[in-house]
A protein has these predicted regions:
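Thiol-based oxidoreductase modules, predominantly thioredoxin-like and allied folds used
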Residues: 37-53
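Generic recognition of short, well-ordered alpha-helical segments
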Residues: 27-30, 51-54, 80
Length: 93
């Protein structure tokens, strides 16, 4: 088991670490937009996002599982359904 990399800083209540090509990422982001849920998106494959990619890998024992969602309370979830993300968002508010 590896150590969890430094948790990325974010100001959003929900930050989705994603890729542009993976269908589960696209679906989650579409569902969040449809619900008008406040969120931020970090493309883990974009240049300059190596630290974010390392964090995503670290939370699943060196496997990069996307989407990974980071909540403003510091908790996270990997590949969550939109309903779970929206429920957590309501809990945070």
């Amino acid at each position: 088991m590896i150590d969890v990399a430094t948790t990325p800083e974010t100001t959003a209540p929900v930050t989705v670490f994603a890729t542009s090509w993976y269908p589960f990422c696209s679906q989650l982001l579409a569902d969040l937009r449809k619900a008008d849920a406040p969120h931020e998106v970090v493309d883990v494959e974009a240049p300059g996002n190596e630290d974010a990619s390392a964090w995503v890998e670290s939370v699943k024992n060196d496997n990069r599982v996307v989407p990974t969602v980071l909540y403003s309370d510091g908790s996270h979830a990997t590949n969550p359904p939109a309903g779970d993300v929206l429920a957590k968002l309501n809990e945070l508010n």
